[in-house]
């Protein structure tokens, strides 16, 4: 009897510890390092010219009118599912907040709800997600909505507004697991709209470094999962120019190993854009050499900072040269992977000459020549299984209705931003390790584990109670 009782107690003690073990596993998932998260990414896709769209000419500013202003349909869960099914395991969601925030940085509730819905769909599909502040930066002028400029005077004047904006975003998503990453700003330009490297020198660099530090401090202060969320900071105009890389200062952080640096590199610009050299459409050794130099520089940059570096945007325009585009993509992705750099292809949803689109969001079909070159040469990654779609929500119904009522706008509107740099295109127009496998559980899995743990604990206590009664009865019989 004594031997049986001891064995039973040991067993029940082990069972009682199970929920603690489960909780510890969940904790580990929620605090993966930046390096672990980047390692788990295979290849990413940009939901371009959608939530980042804007228009000073839009009379009735609503989430639907802005989302479709640059010619793309309203985003649906089916689109996000198609991205996952084609082999991507990460998505970058560019968002322009300017037309939905007041001067104090307070965000309109309907816009925040729409952004959250797209983020939810992406996470439910098992994707890693990057959420950013997009055309609140970039070129500024009469027809723009940019209010963040890379100079210290502007930084000081918008300091509180920027902090308030990121406080609002961070509070909205503070309980989301760490598959969601925040990117502080897209492409900060100096007062002269100078691409690649600033014309104003140290003042612009100091401003970028200040925005980066304020972003990190603001998000961390909101607590919750934001205390250890992996945060992304970009260089001046997200440029990979060597002078820009040299001037970048990584923000200080309250936790270690939770920062990522991002650049955008359409290299070489003469080949990737008709704005560079419209006659240069053949992939050649010059392209290879420039890509080699880019990846080598970024690898050294990553080593200097001590953080992973990602390429948040890259791509090549359609210049009726799909075979050469595919060769470029395959070489670019291969060299990036060899240097430990993960990439996100820019897709503006448009496929005509001079555009970057590879995914038709109306028919849910891909330019297979380009996408096969991308997916087949990307390293393997990992993602959680997609969650079953819930019943259609009111927001989805509104979105679908909007898609029908704005069809005419979608056909006639094609707002195009033009730039003259390798840092930014015309925006309008996988090694799997044990850690990454464990990281990719969604919150539904956590809930199930806790329920199981609770049932086990309850059963254990019942067992102990019955054992106690049995022992007491034996003693009384004696």
What are these regions, as identified by a protein language model?
Residues 70-91, 101-135, 139-184, 207-223:
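An active-site-proximal structural segment forming one wall of the substrate-binding cleft
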Residues 285-379:
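Substrate-binding cleft of secreted/luminal carbohydrate-active enzymes
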